């Protein structure tokens, strides 16, 4: 953990760190056209952190868990700022902005106060907002570092009871701290199991970008059936690593993304002339839940 706001000021603007505080540092973010004509909003630092936390983490999360998530959110945004700024410097781009406003435009989703008021029950708004804001303020300046840089801190809603290894999912040893860990409480999550039914034609259309070799030939004319779907391997946490669709081999994550499934931990069941997909967990399964 380090004193964060001073460091980010140097990374982003090169201003005197002693003159920058959380209260006068602003982030430029993507905003809806309803809120800002040019689609860009300038949001006070802690307000943005609060909005990202509210977007990602359920309001009924226990206080200490919410504080842990607040540290992850702050680290995530700090990492995004650092990487974006370094990319600009590499391209010799110079900022023409002055003061404590980031020149980088972030696209990490957040809830504005207006969106919170629109989405939350009126009698819950103040209580929820203060809970998120308090978590941000209680962990002020706290971020996670790994090897002298901001750590990658992925978050997901729930998993199969085991979190996933970044090395298995990404095929890279860059994040050795994202490991397989038991998470027994996730098995009790209300969103633990999902059931989705698709026609074979729907799957063929949704997965066309990686089934291209089969979309114009005999298989396209004949269509798929249940026997064309086979799970070939799982990773250490029980998520689908590879599966076969007809003659195509794809990853579980490719399949999840194509069908907008909540998780790549899934199984198949025949359902008349359709296929039923049963999922476990919600999200990519890496990091904290």
Segments and roles (model prediction):
Residues 1-288:
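Conserved, single-site charged/polar hotspot
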